[in-house]
Amino acid sequence: MRSLTTKTSSALLTVWGLLSVSLMPSVGQADKTAGDYFVHSLPGAPAGPLLKMHAGHIEVTPEHHGNIFFWHFQNRHIANKQRTVIWLNGGPGCSSEDGALMEIGPYRVKDGSNGPKLEYNPGSWDEFANVMFVDNPVGTGFSFVDSDSYIHDLPEMADQFVQFLEKWFALFPEYEHDDLYLAGESYAGQHIPYITKAILERNKKPDAKHKWPVKGMLIGNGWISPVEQYMSYLPFAYEKGLVKKDSEKAKKLESQQAICTKMLNENGGRDKVDNSQCEQILQEILSTTQSKGSDGNMQCYNMYDVRLKDSYPSCGMNWPPDLVNVTPYLRRSDVVAALHISPEKRTGWTECNGAVGSAFRAANSKPSIQILPELLAEVPTILFSGAEDLICNHIGTEELISNMEWNGGKGFELGSGTWAPRRDWEFEGEPAGFWQEARNLTYVLFYNSSHMVPFDYARRTRDMLDRFMKVDIASIGGAPTDSRIDGEKGLETSVGGHPNSTAAAEAEEERLEAAKWNAYYKSGEIVLVIVVIAASAWGYYIWRERRQRAGYAGIFGGDTPMALAGARSGSRGAAGLEDFRNKRNARDVEAADFDESELDELHVRSPTDDMDRDRYSVGSASDDESIGKRNGNGKGKEKSYS
């Protein structure tokens, strides 16, 4: 019996030891606090106070070493309430660091003299909202998982994302009651609706301690309805003049479109997220329209911005240009350390992971267009499109809206025979696009923009976001941007014009710098006046001495030591004063207008006062316009919508 007990104890200890080893990563994760994720410094960041940010991994599947990476930026200012935006890029398998460093994040990566450096993004979305970029699903970007454990379907991805949020909010409970917005582009048009649905279902469970208040979805150039998107390729090519209608090229493309239509109408084709025969339409457009460039090499249209050309068969895979700086920046060892990248992440950052995209076939998933109507009953949504994108073009988005029934109507129908108007949008005096809305859905078309709208027009997308979130700066001050829809300004939204925004801070610094030099200049004038007065007094003194000495000379004779000394002094004094007068005549300070109040101002705001003055937070929003991802057709034939 004792032997059996000993063996049993030994066996239990062995089992416990194995369990302890297997649970070690989870325990390590559980022991982490928010402070462990705090980013203390960021290589290449602009001078001044660093934005408040957290970054790192949250473990979601310990048994497969599955970790999701996030990069969270705290809002710079609060308008009337706390808001959090979660941003997702597409692919599937493309990193949301595209969004962080090329689109809506606070920084853009530029080429510096000593390597990549960060500059403030004039239209970053973190002015009045916390913004979190998530590399989703596992295996994407800085996220990682065992290579045999990639995600395959949309519901599985959404459930894992909710699990990530549960753990994230446990670490950062102060954000759990924020108004929550899910935003992204391209294939995120599948991810976002599925995640939103999973959150709404989670909120209805009795064991949900806190309901997460989902207030909106924003999807740019979204891959939402494959049917409408496939059928839009040829009309878009005609509209943009890529292919001439009734030409031989057009006939070949129409033949491929007929094959696609047949596939969609058979064997549940309309219920599939991807269809290889239909994707061939896009391939044929890019192939049949290729031409020889000035360098003698073949080139094709950039599928993300048809105003541009790229080498064939890349056709946009070398775009956007910022990528040449972003990739080496995110692979720097000091950046990896600053963002708390786990040593378990053994490979460097890549924009799009082909293995993740290959695994994520969504073979058992329905396209998100089929769940969008039910979501619109609860969640306000914006669909926005860049007018020059081919791969997820605006015609496809407009068609899916026209064909969709939601909230008691079809398309943008307002009533019998009436439709929601397209309202012209003007931003800072330029035509920016149009807005159209009905029954909880808003559609925005951005003129002259690509697949990655925020890359082109970050400030305009920030204006769109602030309008959608109903940010109103009237009560907090600041200069609103001049943004008008059908000539009406609506709520006062700020795009880098808030008193504490980056642009405002930069403008304030320029103003202070000018004031400082103005103060120095005025100080110089004052010194000059003092010198003139002193010189005049000295000159008067010398003149009086000469007069007196002249009198002494008349009494004592001209050869006395005193007379000679007086003559030499007088000569030097007169010559020196005359020279000074000649210089002074060029600019008579005393004769110039002089405002005594300037002396008071100089006293109030001296150069040292300016240096001691508290600066505004460096990293508020700023101002400027500044593109998306990724059909992987040029990369191993894998399609990736970023």
Swiss-Prot record:
Record topology, Lumenal segments: 31-522
Biased composition (Basic and acidic residues): 600-616
Protease as UniProt keyword: yes
Catalytic reaction equation(s): Preferential release of a C-terminal arginine or lysine residue
GO cellular component: membrane; trans-Golgi network
Enzyme class: hydrolase
Main localisation: Golgi
Protein's membrane topology: Single-pass type I membrane protein
Glycosylation sites recorded in the entry for this protein: 440, 448, 500
Region (Disordered): 480-505, 598-642
Transmembrane residue ranges: 523-543
Family designation: Belongs to the peptidase S10 family.
Function (record text): Protease with a carboxypeptidase B-like function involved in the C-terminal processing of the lysine and arginine residues from protein precursors. Promotes cell fusion and is involved in the programmed cell death.
Name by which UniProt lists this protein: Pheromone-processing carboxypeptidase kex1
Designated gene of the protein: kex1
